[in-house]
Regions:
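Active-site-proximal alpha-helix that buttresses catalytic centers in soluble enzyme cores
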Residues: 2-6, 10-88, 116, 130-131, ...
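Short, glycine/charged-enriched secondary-structure capping and boundary segments
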Residues: 22-25, 68-72, 94-97, 122-126, ...
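Conserved histidine-centered catalytic loops in small-molecule metabolism enzymes
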Residues: 52-72, 147-179
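Short alpha-helix plus adjacent loop in nuclease-associated cores
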Residues: 85-97
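Short, surface-exposed amphipathic charged segments that create phosphate/polyanion-binding patches used
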Residues: 94-99, 173-175
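Non-DNA-binding regulatory cores of transcription-related proteins
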Residues: 100-108, 113-135
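Domain-level recognition of soluble alpha/beta enzyme cores
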Residues: 127-159
Length: 179
């Protein structure tokens, strides 16, 4: 038996399609995207989720999403912005996860669809139809090292999406959002 390692697949916050002059890579997030990611990040904070490392796509919207996570989690450790996370083949993403340091118990990957949904479905023995903007999937693995990760052996701890908080935001999260 190994110990539990947890992977958080975090889709970038809702991006702005109205800036016609911006390339896909340069699109930033919307006000709604910012608000949604602040809510999701506050949820992680209340669950005492702190990553050992954040791996983020280097697109503008992923960087802005990561900035919100860093701020709301009071995180000041390792953040790596990787070109490989910008619309990479799923197998490359799998290999990137498998290469993480064995000392890391909790790894965040901030990226894009369809790659995040595809990798989630490869890693778990269930089916997620889509990870929406600002959606977060937490997957546990009973392994000692990330290199031991295999398809279909991950177990979903939780899957949260902004719409869960559309009509009701718990008081603890509201308090954090007001800070």
């Amino acid at each position: 038996m190994g110990k539990i390692k947890t992977l958080y697949l975090i889709r970038n916050a809702k991006s702005d399609w109205n800036d016609i002059g911006a390339s896909d890579f340069e699109r930033g997030i919307t006000k709604k995207g910012k608000k949604d990611m602040e809510t999701m990040s506050s949820y992680l904070f209340l669950k005492n989720v702190i990553p050992d490392i954040i791996l983020s796509s280097c697109s503008l919207r992923a960087q802005q999403t990561t900035d919100i996570l860093v701020d709301k989690l009071n995180y000041s450790d390792k953040v790596e912005y990787l070109q490989e996370l910008y619309y990479t083949p799923t197998q490359t993403l799998f290999e990137l996860i498998a290469m993480q340091d064995a000392a890391y118990e909790t790894v965040f990957v901030v990226g894009h669809n369809p790659q995040l949904t595809d990798i989630a479905n490869l890693l778990i023995d269930e089916h997620i139809s889509k990870i929406p903007s600002s959606g977060i999937v937490s997957i546990n693995f009973d392994i000692q090292e990330w290199s031991e990760i295999v398809y279909k052996k991950g177990v979903v701890d939780f899957f949260i999406i902004p719409k869960q908080f559309k009509y009701y935001v718990p008081k603890q999260i509201r308090t954090l959002l007001e800070k």
